[in-house]
Amino acid sequence: MFQSKAQVRLVEHLLQNRQKVFNQAGLARVLDVSPSTVARIAEPLVKSKILLFERYEKGMKIFAFNQEEPAARSLVEFYEKISGL
C-alpha cells in the first residue's frame, strides 16, 4: 500500500494528529524531507482520498487526514490496534 518509508512516516504523523491541518512546508520539516518529496508521497494518498488537499493563497498547499473516507477509517482502526500492543 505504501511506496516508501517517507510515505509511511507521513501516514503515521497524520494518524497521530488526525484533527490537525498541515501545510506542505510544515510536513516537510516534521518528516525531514523536501517539500517536493511531501508533494510526491502525498499524491497517491490524495488520489485514494485518504488525504484531503487544498491550495490556498499564493500557492500554499494544505493537507488534512480524511476521516470520512472508509479506507482512512480502516487505517485508524489498524493504527489504534497496533499502538495498543
Language model segments and positions:
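Short helix-capping/hinge SLiMs at alpha-helix to coil transitions
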Residues: 15-19
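Key DNA-contact positions within bacterial/archaeal DNA-binding proteins
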Residues: 35-36
